[in-house]
């Protein structure tokens, strides 16, 4: 293990169109095979579609969607004796944002719409309204944590 501690976080550059680090993170999550310009096109068109459907600022829609998808608790496996327990732990703010973006992208890819732009736009709109698969994933995660509350004293 390295003795110098964890590597410092690199600062995220705000995206050129909306000036938001969240949009930059979303672009980086959409990214496949290093095709950044394709990822940017998908994200910007999806945000533009969201603006057309709602009539509000797409960054506000994205933030609202993230707030509805961010988990507060998750379970982590902890081995005690011969048994493995699912121990509920609080999620750090940075990790909760990362998980929310990851879930949004994963469930966008699984949707049935024709293009990725439509899928992402509709998943963002669903999430901002408290619907969709990503919000369900968060609720399932919270249910798991609630069900395993008895093992909370094994937290580390």
Swiss-Prot record:
SUPFAM superfamilies: Ribosomal protein S7. The keyword Transmembrane helix does not apply. One of its GO terms (biological process) is translation. The keyword RNA-binding applies. One of its GO terms (cellular component) is small ribosomal subunit. Gene3D superfamilies: Ribosomal protein S7 domain. Pfam families: Ribosomal_S7 (PF00177). Keywords: Ribonucleoprotein, Ribosomal protein, RNA-binding, rRNA-binding, tRNA-binding. GO terms for molecular function: rRNA binding; structural constituent of ribosome; tRNA binding. PANTHER family: RIBOSOMAL PROTEIN S7. Belongs to the universal ribosomal protein uS7 family. Part of the 30S ribosomal subunit. Contacts proteins S9 and S11. One of the primary rRNA binding proteins, it binds directly to 16S rRNA where it nucleates assembly of the head domain of the 30S subunit. Is located at the subunit interface close to the decoding center, probably blocks exit of the E-site tRNA. This is Small ribosomal subunit protein uS7. The lineage of its organism: Bacteria, Bacillati, Actinomycetota, Actinomycetes, Mycobacteriales.
């Amino acid at each position: 293990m390295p003795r110098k501690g964890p590597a410092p976080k690199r600062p995220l550059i705000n995206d050129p169109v909306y000036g938001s680090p969240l949009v930059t993170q979303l672009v980086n999550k959409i990214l496949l095979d290093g095709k950044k310009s394709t990822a940017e096109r998908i994200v910007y068109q999806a945000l533009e579609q969201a603006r057309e459907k709602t009539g509000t600022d797409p960054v506000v829609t994205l933030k609202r969607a993230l707030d509805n998808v961010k988990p507060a608790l998750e379970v982590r496996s902890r081995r005690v004796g011969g048994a493995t327990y699912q121990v509920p732990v609080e999620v750090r703010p940075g990790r909760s944002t990362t998980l929310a973006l990851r879930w949004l992208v994963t469930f966008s890819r699984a949707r049935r719409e024709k293009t990725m732009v439509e899928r992402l736009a509709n998943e963002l709109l669903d999430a901002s309204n408290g619907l969709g698969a990503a919000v369900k994933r968060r609720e399932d995660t919270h249910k798991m944590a609630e069900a395993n509350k008895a093992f909370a004293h094994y937290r580390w």
